[in-house]
Amino acid sequence: MVVKRILPLPRPAGLAPPTEVPLDGQDLAMPKMVMHCIWFFLASSQPSLESTSLQELEQAFTLGMQLFLARFPAAGARTRHDKDTARWYLEYNDQGADLEVIQLDRPLQDDWKALDGKCDSVFAPRPVMIFDDDASIFSIKVTRLSCGSVAISTSTHHWLVDFVGYIDLMEELSHCVSIFLNDPNAQINIDEGATKFDWSRDLLAYSKQLEPESIPSATWFTERGSPPQMTRAPSSCHYASLLFTQESLEKLKRSLAEWALETAPTTATDRIVPSKDNWIATNDALHALLWAAITDARGLDLNATTQLHTPLDGRRLLSSLSSADSQSRGKYIGNVHPGHVFPLPSSVVSAKDRSGLFNLAWLIRTQYLNVTPGQMSAIIRHHNYTDAETFGPGRLPKCTSMFGNDVTISNVARIPVRQRLDFGEKLGKPYTLTVVGMVPVTLNGLTLDSADGTCFIIQAPAEWTSKEAVLQHQPRSGDNQAPGGMLVYVGMRSEEMDKLLQNSLLQEFALVL
């Protein structure tokens, strides 16, 4: 086993980032917690892995990370809390990132499927937490198993990047590592082939608003550091893995429209019904069902408010952020997804009356897509906290939003992650990405088993069409990895999970693995 701190190579002056920048309000809208991801490279589908030694992996990742940190200095930075101003800064001090490389004397077997929804600490790297100025905010662990399969796990902080930015980060890392996997003695200029990035974390500069006042304010920073106030008492959580096949997802979307139309002629209501102008996508239908089923399982009072937090679904709402040509500022690094919540009465968010689910899905879709750059800017600038009268209509999640009546859905199933990551001929592309369970959440000293009501959605292999097919599936070299359905990891408090799994619509459209 090798554990070490990797420092960046010296970089040309033209690639040097600023000394420090304040973390943007959009960054701080994300929870103060770790984002874990694990990528599996299967020897059964990549035969060259069997002959790739642990020493080769260690050398390539050491050299590759040195190059990567020179090109992507945000991963080797540190956070700094200025107590006088209450502001959080990202300080580009080149302190590096942590690398761990280990060999396990056992095969991978079905661990890559992560069907039990539990975190396997064997694969997990040191979790990065913002509590110490000298702690790194990016760590990586490379695990080689006796069968030749490799697991690459990372720990990043939600304040550093959202998932779209994380894929930018991993794409750059995979390119850097592939250079030295292909040729351990490779000589390369740091800026040769490097992606241009914008390190300013000034999201509002892209929204072209008339009001140029700076954010974040002292009020913003003070609130983000305040202890969470739980709307429901913390409780231990249980995990479930739900499989929605491509067929069941299409059936779900179609059924929501059919149910809405069945009652439309006889019911006087202000609900939206399907038409050529009012339509929903598969993601919208799935998110509506999950939000409604979780809310029903909680048995909330009809007057209670539940909020949907969709921090990511794979789309950038500011298209200019993805540009990296020489005339632009480069790819924007930081959180770019709408850090807002969508509040509704729990009576509206219910699967008990299935005819209302299309309307709920339509509301989710329009709320998300109508967050324009200008609205996003205003939400961040003027705070709009959910329960403070002085901060507008309540569009931005407080620290407590993931621990109360709310539901958080992170859907990365449509992001082409596998196509973008390539570690070269020996390691290849990852076969799958998984969270391998939801790791414990620590927020200002309070540790919970999981964020209650959190759904993390990834793409499932096309071969996963039944529980039996999932259990028997073993990829082979040359298999065409066609897009499949969606695998949903759901975390809920234990006493409510049974009610969730008894939901008749979930039983109709999902397989419990």
Swiss-Prot record:
Stored Pfam families? Transferase
Question: Where does this protein act, in terms of pathway?
Answer: Secondary metabolite biosynthesis
Asked whether the keyword Transit peptide is assigned, the reply is no
Any one GO MF term held by the record is: acyltransferase activity, transferring groups other than amino-acyl groups
Family to which this protein belongs: Belongs to the plant acyltransferase family.
Which gene specifies this protein's sequence?
A: uat1
What lineage, starting at the top, does this entry show?
Eukaryota, Fungi, Dikarya, Basidiomycota, Ustilaginomycotina
Name the source's superkingdom: Eukaryota
What does the function comment of this entry state? Answer: Acyltransferase; part of the gene cluster that mediates the biosynthesis of the glycolipid biosurfactant ustilagic acid (UA). UA is a secreted cellobiose glycolipid that is toxic for many microorganisms and confers biocontrol activity to U.maydis. UA consists of 15,16-dihydroxypalmitic or 2,15,16-trihydroxypalmitic acid, which is O-glycosidically linked to cellobiose at its terminal hydroxyl group. In addition, the cellobiose moiety is acetylated and acylated with a short-chain hydroxy fatty acid.
Catalytic residues as annotated in Swiss-Prot or TrEMBL:
158
Per its UniProt record, what InterPro entries does this chain match? Answer: CAT-like_dom_sf, Plant_Fungal_Acyltransferase
Its keywords, alphabetically, are: Acyltransferase, Transferase
E.C. number, please?
2.3.1.-
Report the source organism.
Mycosarcoma maydis (Corn smut fungus)
Please give the name of this protein.
Acyltransferase uat1
> What is known about its induction?
Expression is strongly induced under conditions of nitrogen starvation. Expression is positively regulated by the cluster-specific transcription factor rua1 that recognizes and binds to the specific 5'-T/G-G/T-C-G-C-A-T-A/T-C/T-C/T-G/A-3' upstream activating sequence found in all promoters of the UA biosynthesis genes.
